[in-house]
Regions:
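Multi-pass membrane proteins that catalyze or facilitate reactions on polyprenyl-/lipid-phosphate substrates
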Residues: 1-296
C-alpha cells in the first residue's frame, strides 16, 4: 500500500513538473531520495517512462483538435476559420479526400518534424552516454540555475516589446529547427527542462509566450513518445502484478495532474511572464547543491 501511495505522489510530481518549465528530472531525482520507491533500479527506469507517457497523453487529449489533421466537426469556430483561410486549397482539391485534410495542421507537423531533427540525430543515439556523464547533482543544479537566470534575463529584455511570431502559421521552419536545438540542450543536460529550454529558445527568437508554450507541448508528443518507446524496448515488459498496479497508478495520476497543470499554464501566461519560474529554478538549484554537499 505504501508503494502505491508513493506511485501516486510520483505521478503528481511528474504531471506538474513536466509541463511547468522547472525540470521534471530535477524534481524526480530529489523525490526519489526522500520518498524512494522500494523497487529495482531497472523497474524504476521503467516507471519513469510510464508516468511520462501518462503526461504525454494529456497533451494529446487537450490539443486533439489542433494536432489531428483529418476531418473536423461541422460548424465549429476552428473549422470555419480554417475553411476561410484555406478556401483556395479546398477549391483545388474539390470534394475529394483532400477536402478532409487540415493543411495547417499538416504544416504544423512538418515544423515539428524539423524541430525534432537535432534530437533524432544527436539526442537519441547518445542518450545513454549523456545520462552517464551528466545525470549528477552538480549538473542538474547548474542547469536549473542557468536556465532560471535565462528566463529572468529574456523576460526583462522582452518587457514591453511585441512578439514577432503570434501564431503557429507565422512560425517558420527555420525557427522550428532553432527551437529544436534548444530542446537538444535539455536532452544533454538533465535539470535544464525540455519545456524550459524550448520556451526560452522560442522567446529569444521572438515567439509569443502562448505560441511558445503550445509549440513546446506539441513538440513533446513525438520526442517524448520516441524516448519512452526506446526505453520500453530496452527494459522490456517483465513485471509482477503489484508492479503493474504501481505503473498504472503513476500513469493515471500523471495524466490527470498534467491536464490540470497545462490548462493552468495556458491561462497563466496570458497575463503573466515566466520570471516566477526562473526564480523558482534558482532556489531549487541552490537546494540541490546544498543537498549534494551535506546530505547525499
Amino acid at each position: 500500500m505504501i508503494e502505491f501511495l508513493k506511485s501516486f505522489l510520483f505521478g503528481i510530481v511528474e504531471g506538474i513538473t513536466e509541463w511547468l518549465p522547472i525540470s521534471s528530472t530535477g524534481h524526480l531525482i530529489l523525490l526519489n531520495q526522500f520518498v524512494k520507491l522500494d523497487v529495482s533500479e531497472e523497474f524504476y527506469s521503467m516507471f519513469e517512462v510510464v508516468i511520462q507517457l501518462g503526461a504525454i497523453l494529456a497533451v494529446v487529449i487537450l490539443f486533439w483538435n489542433q494536432i489531428f489533421p483529418f476531418g473536423a466537426p461541422e460548424g465549429s469556430h476552428t473549422v470555419r476559420r480554417r475553411q476561410a483561410k484555406h478556401a483556395h486549397r479546398k477549391k483545388k482539391s474539390g470534394n475529394g479526400i483532400l477536402s478532409y485534410v487540415k493543411m495547417d495542421i499538416i504544416i504544423l507537423w512538418l515544423k515539428v518534424l524539423v524541430a525534432c531533427i537535432p534530437a533524432i540525430v544527436i539526442g537519441m543515439p547518445f542518450n545513454d552516454l549523456f545520462e552517464k556523464w551528466f545525470y549528477k547533482y552538480p549538473c542538474v543544479a547548474i542547469a536549473l540555475i542557468i536556465f532560471g537566470i535565462a528566463f529572468i534575463i529574456v523576460e526583462n529584455n522582452h518587457k514591453g516589446k511585441p512578439a514577432k511570431i503570434n501564431s503557429m502559421d507565422e512560425l517558420t521552419y527555420k525557427t522550428a529547427f532553432l527551437i529544436g536545438l534548444f530542446q537538444l540542450i535539455a536532452a544533454i543536460f538533465p535539470g535544464t527542462s525540455r519545456s524550459g529550454a524550448t520556451i526560452v529558445g522560442a522567446l529569444i527568437l521572438g515567439v509569443s509566450r502562448t505560441v511558445a508554450a503550445e509549440f513546446t507541448f506539441v513538440l513533446a508528443i513525438p520526442v517524448m513518445f520516441g524516448a519512452s518507446l526506446l526505453k520500453l524496448v530496452k527494459f522490456g515488459l517483465n513485471f509482477t502484478g503489484t508492479e503493474a498496479i504501481i505503473l498504472l497508478i503513476g500513469m493515471v495520476t500523471a495524466f490527470v495532474s498534467s491536464i490540470i497543470v497545462i490548462q493552468f499554464l495556458m491561462g497563466y501566461i496570458k497575463k503573466h511572464d515566466f520570471k516566477v519560474f526562473g526564480y523558482y529554478r534558482i532556489v531549487l538549484g541552490i537546494l540541490v547543491i546544498l543537498y549534494a554537499l551535506f546530505l547525499a
